[in-house]
Amino acid sequence: MLSLQCLPPFFISVPNRSTNSCSTAPLRAVSDFAASPSTSISRRLILLRHAHSSWDDLSLRDHDRPLSKTGEADAAKVAQILSSLGWLPQLILSSDATRTRETLKSMQAQVDGFMEANVHFIPSFYSIAAMDGQTAEHLQNIISKYSTPDISTIMCMGHNKGWEEAASMLSGASIKLKTCNAALLQAFGNSWEEAFALSGPGGWKLEGLVAPDSSIFV
């Protein structure tokens, strides 16, 4: 069982641990990297599940469902918490589903720093999240494609079950992400590709979990 220590507000620092409970596809490994601890750069990854969506219009496709009023408020709260923790992304990679777009819109309206990030909407984030054990490797590939060495913090916005699986596989902890919950992960490398290669599955440090309220489930 993980030992949790509460930090204000609504942030929990979580020790890293290894587990074999996640049944997922292996991440691509690169054995040629040789990072020096003195020069290796911190790479911070935010895995954020979209905020609560509305089911009022049952004629809409799942892809097109908007946020509920609760979801809009929760997204604004999480944006403020991430800002207060100093976890503002320079690059945002998001599913193109309406509820993820609107989650980002609410975050940008609350905190100007989210407006400054470079944003790419990735259609495959919507579909990959439904496939068993595929999300972590897909995130690695997309992040490696869009990142540059000067970017230290990236936020990926998407859906369950894939986002929970990816957070669990990368950190080695058993992570549950409710709507608008975020896992904060850290690794080191002179590039994002190197950080993934050196850390491997289970090697990303789980720095904490963020939620719009004080209910955190690990």
Swiss-Prot record:
UniProtKB keywords: Chloroplast, Hydrolase, Plastid, Transit peptide
Feature: transit peptide: 1-28
Hydrolase in keyword set: yes
Stored InterPro entries: His_Pase_superF_clade-1, His_PPase_superfam
Gene3D superfamilies membership: Phosphoglycerate mutase-like (3.40.50.1240)
GO MF terms, alphabetically ordered: hydrolase activity
Entry's Gene Ontology cellular component terms: chloroplast
Designated name of the protein: Uncharacterized protein At3g52155, chloroplastic
Species in which this protein is naturally found: Arabidopsis thaliana
